[in-house]
């Protein structure tokens, strides 16, 4: 990231332990280095064999696996499903440019080498209808295993934090994110209420009218001045702006 204003967002700060398996579509995306796999990003299971994550999480030179049904990373709980990713099954949005995170399109799809086994601890995320826009202050939750504070450790247990949505009208004001934020993004947080942000690539979970949860955002970036910077909410790729691309990519692969 060459931009002075942003960096990959990788923490839930001032969050809380999630209820185990409550965000049952949350995955850990891990890359291989020196014979071991390391957590790098979050993601959401949107089909039995497809995960959505952030474009900046993917490097085509790396080998990845996905862990589903995870809660406490330090314990083998028996619910985990570890699924390898084949090299040709990483689909980063064609307009993603790693030198311009503010340009948007920070989204990628990962095809699993086999289908997940769905159950109470591994479920599919619901996606919003195309074009759906959240109202200001919508009570969304971020989730992830990101760092607990800047430069700090990764937590063992999945964290969550309430991040109210900041609508485009507010988030694009000059003293907030200004022109950095685009209409294809969602802002949430930006004050001290909930602290910070979750793993890059992970979900912004928002309640739908029927009481279910929908993944409205893919965690993209935060302020370089730190996590819970006033008027610098966490910025997410707006999933409802990319429904067509998601559908087309899955259908053709």
Curated annotation (Swiss-Prot):
Does the record bear Disulfide bond in its keywords? yes
Q: Where in the cell is it found?
A: Secreted, Extracellular space
Tissue specificity note: Pancreas.
Disulfide pairings:
41-57, 100-103, 140-206, 171-187, 196-227
The record's listing under PROSITE patterns reads: TRYPSIN_DOM, TRYPSIN_HIS, TRYPSIN_SER
What transmembrane ranges does the database entry give? none
Where is it mainly found?
A: secreted
Alphabetical GO CC annotations of the entry are: extracellular space
Q: Can the keyword Plastid be found in this entry's annotation?
A: no
Q: Which ranges of residues are annotated as propeptide in this record?
A: 1-11
Its GO biological process annotations read: digestion; proteolysis
Q: Which family does it belong to?
A: Belongs to the peptidase S1 family.
The protein's job, in short, is: May protect procarboxypeptidase A against denaturation in the acidic environment of the ruminant duodenum.
Q: How does it assemble?
A: Monomer. The zymogen is secreted as a ternary complex composed of procarboxypeptidase A, chymotrypsinogen C and proproteinase E.
The name under which this protein is listed is Proproteinase E
Taxonomic lineage from the root: Eukaryota, Metazoa, Chordata, Craniata, Vertebrata
